[in-house]
């Protein structure tokens, strides 16, 4: 057991360390939620990760994205994520994929016999395309719903997609996947009604939503923890709505 894994091993044992090292994860989105999910996965010792994100860091990311620094502004998120992972665990098998998630790329994104999909993207159309393909393959999926417009970390919940409530993004995803078997999709979402504040639009016309660093961090680390529990063979919130 490596020195890096010593404290984890005291909790999960040598067999747990082996399971984590042999596990493989596709992570879509390396932003506010995905960056923290990556941090948890890498530090837990997940052996193989594919990071998918077509975006680059901007100054507006600095308030909430753990991978965003003044030095990474303007750089591709997927590449920065891989550099961060290797700085923690040089032996990790990690691959950047700087592509947009859509109908034309989801098959490639999920290719390669991965164990788990961790979904941290927030565009409805892209999310539905990804989760539809994931449901077809049956890959174990842990998906973040809307983390923006929330203040209360104690309202974060875990549930199967079909049992989510309150969250508008979850409602849109449920509607978009109503003809799919979503039994392999477990969600992290908030039961706090979204805060009603004015929203802006970016240069592409996409809504810009207010967000703290704290709520996305809880979402991301919860996604990582669900993945870790699944790899270790521990129940990951399939049965119904569960508070953290």
Give residue spans per PLM region.
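Conserved S-adenosyl-L-methionine
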Residues: 42-48, 136
């Amino acid at each position: 057991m490596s020195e890096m894994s010593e404290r984890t091993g005291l909790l999960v044992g040598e067999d747990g360390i082996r399971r984590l090292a042999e596990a493989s994860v596709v992570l879509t989105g390396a932003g506010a939620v995905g960056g923290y999910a990556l941090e948890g996965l890498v530090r837990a010792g997940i052996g193989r990760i594919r990071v998918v994100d077509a975006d680059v860091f901007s100054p507006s990311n600095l308030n909430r994205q753990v991978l965003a620094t003044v030095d990474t502004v303007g750089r591709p998120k997927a590449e920065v994520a891989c550099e961060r992972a290797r700085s923690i665990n040089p032996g990790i098998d990690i691959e950047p994929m700087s592509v947009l998630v859509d109908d034309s790329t989801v098959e490639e994104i999920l290719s390669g016999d991965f164990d788990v999909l961790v979904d941290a993207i927030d565009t409805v159309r892209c999310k539905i395309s990804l989760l539809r393909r994931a449901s077809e393959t049956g890959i174990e999926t842990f998906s973040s719903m809307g983390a923006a417009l929330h203040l209360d970390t104690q309202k974060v919940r875990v549930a199967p997609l079909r049992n989510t409530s309150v969250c508008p993004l979850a409602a849109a995803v449920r509607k978009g996947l109503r003809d799919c078997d979503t039994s392999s999709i477990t969600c992290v979402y908030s039961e706090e009604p979204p805060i009603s504040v004015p929203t802006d639009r970016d240069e592409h016309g996409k809504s810009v939503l207010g967000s703290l660093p704290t709520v996305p961090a809880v979402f991301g680390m919860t996604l990582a923890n669900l993945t870790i529990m699944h790899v270790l063979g521990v129940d990951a919130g399939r049965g119904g709505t569960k508070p953290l």
